[in-house]
Amino acid sequence: MSQVYSVAVVVGSLRKESYNRKVARALSELAPSSLALKIVEIGDLPLYNEDIEAEAPPETWKRFRDEIRRSDAVLFVTPEYNRSVPGCLKNAIDVGSRPYGQSAWSGKPTAVVSVSPGAIGGFGANHAVRQSLVFLDMPCMQMPEAYLGGAASLFEDSGKLNDKTRPFLQAFVDRFASWVKLNRAV
């Protein structure tokens, strides 16, 4: 029996029907049997504050960190707000990285998908997330890069991926499965 890797999917949009959440769901459906993708919610995480960490960390922080620690890999799916990372995603990254020296992210293979209505597909957010991941010691898949622009055009009226988008995301998630296997062995 082959290894099944658990992948925490962190979506940087809080909207229930955001394009990013739709792409995350589609990736879950397209994932090969070696990956089990699960969206980890970030909307209930209080803003990170080291004073609170020292006094009594919120249960939501503990639960989030535990979910990340239990995962074998992490997939970030993010929109772009003002050419950068949405505040909720940056907060989740910060919460998972603390207390200092006890990061839940360390060593976890990762990849970033950015989804935007704009033409450049969230390029700024994608790279801002990657910059944090380098510091957090997360081996990040470099290719294929995933900048999905024109988000409304990625889906059919039914909400499913269209025939133009599906092959790219299939290739992406297949490559990510190989990346996870390669980097979890290290």
Swiss-Prot record:
Per the UniProt entry, the dependence of activity on temperature is: Optimum temperature is 70 degrees Celsius for chromate reductase activity.
Its catalytic activity?
a quinone + NADH + H(+) = a quinol + NAD(+); a quinone + NADPH + H(+) = a quinol + NADP(+); Cr(6+) + 2 NADH + O2 = Cr(3+) + superoxide + 2 NAD(+) + 2 H(+); Cr(6+) + 2 NADPH + O2 = Cr(3+) + superoxide + 2 NADP(+) + 2 H(+)
Query: GO CC: one term?
Result: cytosol
What induces this protein's gene, according to its Swiss-Prot or TrEMBL record?
Induced by H(2)O(2). Induced by both chromate and the stationary phase.
Q: Which Pfam families match?
A: FMN_red
Top-level enzyme category: oxidoreductase
- Identify the keywords attached in UniProt to this record, alphabetized: Flavoprotein, FMN, NAD, NADP, Oxidoreductase
UniProt remark on cofactor binding? Binds 1 FMN per subunit.
Highest taxon of source: Bacteria
Keyword flag Iron-sulfur: no
Q: Flavoprotein: present as a keyword of the record?
A: yes
| Regulation acting on activity, per entry | May be inhibited by divalent cations.
Q: What is its EC number?
A: 1.6.5.2, 1.6.-.-
Cofactor(s) required for function per UniProt: FMN
pH effects: Optimum pH is 5 for chromate reductase activity.
Q: What does the similarity note say? A: Belongs to the SsuE family.
**Known function:** Catalyzes the reduction of quinones. Acts by simultaneous two-electron transfer, avoiding formation of highly reactive semiquinone intermediates and producing quinols that promote tolerance of H(2)O(2). Quinone reduction is probably the primary biological role of ChrR. Can also reduce toxic chromate to insoluble and less toxic Cr(3+). Catalyzes the transfer of three electrons to Cr(6+) producing Cr(3+) and one electron to molecular oxygen. This reaction produces transiently a minimal amount of the toxic Cr(5+) species and reactive oxygen species (ROS).
Description of how the protein assembles with itself and partners: Homotetramer. Dimer of dimers. The tetrameric configuration has a central role in chromate reductase activity.
| Protein name per Swiss-Prot or TrEMBL | Quinone reductase
Source organism (scientific name): Pseudomonas putida (strain ATCC 47054 / DSM 6125 / CFBP 8728 / NCIMB 11950 / KT2440)
